[in-house]
Amino acid sequence: MRTALITGASSGIGLATARKFLEEGVAVVGVSRDRAKLDAAADSCADLSAPFFPFAADITADETPARAVKLALEETGRLDHLVNNAGVGSPQPVHSTDDEMLDQFLDLMLRAPFRLAREALAAFGDTATIVNVSSTYALVGGLRGGAYSAAKAGLNGLTLHMAAQYGSSGIRSNAVAPGVIPTPMTEHRLEVEAFRRMNYDMTPSARWGTVQDVAEAIWFLSSPASGWINGQVLAVDGGWTSTKFLTESALSSDRDDQPADWSHSGR
């Protein structure tokens, strides 16, 4: 049975992706640091077409990548897909991001995916896929969240490099760059009106994206249907990054983007 290793699998995009793979008959090793949420996620998937193997662990820990891949091989005898999804967000601008926060972001969203890919590459068979979950904020600049954008942009670079290096071995590497998706990670930001308008009012599709939208894109990039797609970063954002579209409400709104502390404004 084909097998996928999916990080951040206890909620949001990760859980939706796990469910999609399971519905398609692909076994899933789901990784999350939250044991209770992960067990609940596994229970919610019990009636689907393939087994869900929960693995509660911190993916930034040195031993986790090897242990996660080992579990997949022990349970099903193979590993075919890796989805690096786990992440965390922060609205902090560069000038107020300390080294501890910077290390946290780079460890979780760049170093851990790198190390997981390294372990998975050694375990893959003749054909396999890696899909990294990036962000539209790795494609365009934003007003805050510099460490997040930097980590995700690094993930894009890793994606392209692996596509070039391992494509001839039958291993495809792509990324999805979701727009702002309502999830437990983003719900606190969606309470801020300016943030909601910045994202919703600039989306031509005129709706919020869903975790299912992203899961479908990840599945597509992992399936034979995308067999000639390699080294791409697919924006899953309703057109947000492709246009300067603005609704009337956004065009008529007051602009409030000046830094509170002008000592960091470059003036």
Predicted regions span which residues?
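Alpha-helical segment proximal to the catalytic Tyr-Lys
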Residues: 122, 164-168, 227
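Residue(s) in the substrate-gating loop at a strand-loop-helix junction
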Residues: 135
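Short, small/polar-rich loop/turn modules that mediate ligand/substrate recognition or access, typified
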Residues: 83, 167, 172, 229-231
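Active-site helix of classical SDR
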Residues: 117, 151, 159
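Conserved glycine-rich cofactor-binding loop
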Residues: 10-12
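Substrate-binding pocket helix/loop in short-chain dehydrogenase/reductase
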Residues: 93-94, 98-106, 199
